[in-house]
């Protein structure tokens, strides 16, 4: 098949692309590298860096002209409903729908469907500390109404919606186009497993990115309390907004990753960390695991509560001799559930039913 993947979140489309290529398919990735993360892509969505009239051309005119010429793909998959600027997004997507065989939406971010499920009380707590995201979909504002309108039109255009986790499946539960959850893909050939040895102090790391959504306030509070009470046993690193290569360097020296505490499920950062043999503290609920046919995971579940996180940090300190084996179990879990070759096959099966 000839496949176009449009947009990127934390290497999700990169790893899916690599799995699909391993299956013998022709895949092209269009993205701007997920912003400051600078992730690889075959072609940019739009050029950045210029100002004035040139910026208007780069941001609006050129991509509209170029993507109208993207034709003849068997599958065009969007990583979110709004990949381009709001002024041209739906114009481009209508052209992609017209000029290619099938148009698919990957549900991998907190779009209007997820916000609606939260407002209706179906999803709990995920935006309790991230009210800024809710404002983007405020129906009392013109900007919010236009954003909702544009997303709804994209949903009308796509042939299939593929959720990557429980909350996105719940968000689209009333949409007949939604498929079963397909787990996140990881290219294990590119993510090296290294024994998680504790050399001196246990190193704990929390990466700063979308702090309100991830619950950084609670994670930071617990980590600082741990450092205060166990100064000779632990090192804590709280840093962020790093290019992916720099982020991976920090991961290399870390024993335990604290990712997020205000969700139902773990994401790409947690998956990559587990694949590298790290102990991961994150969200991992029974509902989310059930959606990917798993009864348990090696993820240590945490919630938006400083005391809860702190107690689990102390438990790890008291089990430092088990950290290496815990990291090994993390890797084995990713090999079983998230191998990009297995995930690529699941996407091919979903697309094949169109």
Residue ranges and their predicted role:
Residues 252-265, 278:
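Acidic donor-binding loop of glycosyltransferase active sites
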Residues 178-214, 220:
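Conserved donor-binding/catalytic core segment of Leloir-type glycosyltransferases
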Residues 139-179, 221:
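A short, active-site helix/loop in glycosyltransferases that binds the activated sugar's phosphate group
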